[in-house]
C-alpha cells in the first residue's frame, strides 16, 4: 500500500478532539464573536432553489457518507477553518483540508496544520514534477473518500482576487486522475459545492494592491512575508456578516442529466461539471445591500494601500469589482437554464 507521508494530514485520533476542544474551537469562537457581526451555516436557503425542509434533509443525507466540499476561495486560512468549525459544530463532520506548500514557511507551521487535519498540496517543480505531485494528491484524496472521509478543497488554485469565482477544470482533472470514467469518479467524490460569503473582505486592499503590482509588472513575484501578512489580516480583520451555504451533491444533477452527459467527450464533461459547480456556488451567494456607508468604507480601504506609483482610480475600480462580481454572477445564475 502506498504511503502519503509527504502530504498527508497527521492521524492523531482522539488527541485531535481534545485539541479542538481546548485550543482550536475557543480561538475560532473568539474570532466569530469579535470579528464578525453574525455567522451561520445554511443548507440551501437564501436565494437558491433549495428552500424546503425536504431539500435540507436531502443535503443532510448527502453529507452522511462524507463529501468533497468544493468552495470559492477568498481567505487563505478562514475559508477552511470556519467551514470545519461549523460542520463539526452542527454535524460532527471534520473535513480534511488542502493547504498549499507555499504557505508552509516554517517547520512548526507545517506540523501544526497537518496536526489540524490539513493535507499538503505541493505546487513546486517543472511540468513532470507538477504532474507527479497531482497524481499523488489525487490518489490520496480518492483514498480518503474511499474510507468515507470528508474533504475541503478550493475550486481553484489561489484566491479569486477580483471576486469572480470560477472553477478551474484542472482541479477536476486532478481529482479524477487514474479513473477510467470521469463521471463515475465525480460521483464517488460526492462533491457538495459550498458558497462562502463575507460581507467585508479584510484583505480587499491588499488584493487591490497586488492587482496593480501585477498590472505594472507582469513578472512581479510575491516577496517573502506577503502570504503571512495576508493570513494575519484575514484572521484578525473584521468580516461583518458571514454565511456558509452548502448546496446539494452534484450527483443529483448528474442523475437528472445522465443521458446528455454520457453523450459528451471527457473534456466536455469536465467543462459541464465545472459550470455546474460555479452555478451552485453563485446561486448560493448572500448578496449584501450596499449603501453610501459602503462607499465611505471603500475610500478608507483605498487610503490603507501603500505603494509607489499609486493609481487611485485603478485601485478603486478593483475594490468595487471584487464586491460587484459576486452580485453579477448571482444574477446570471438565477437566469441560467439547462446545462
What is the predicted role of each segment?
Residues 1-67, 73-92, 96, 100-107, ...:
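Membrane-interfacial terminal anchoring regions of lipid-handling membrane enzymes
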Residues 96-131:
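Conserved nucleotide-cofactor-binding alpha/beta core module
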Residues 126, 157, 294:
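Residue-level "edge-of-site" marker
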Residues 129-130, 157-162:
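Short helix/strand-bridging catalytic loops that position acidic/His residues to coordinate divalent metals
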Residues 154:
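Acidic beta-strand-to-loop metal/phosphate-binding motif
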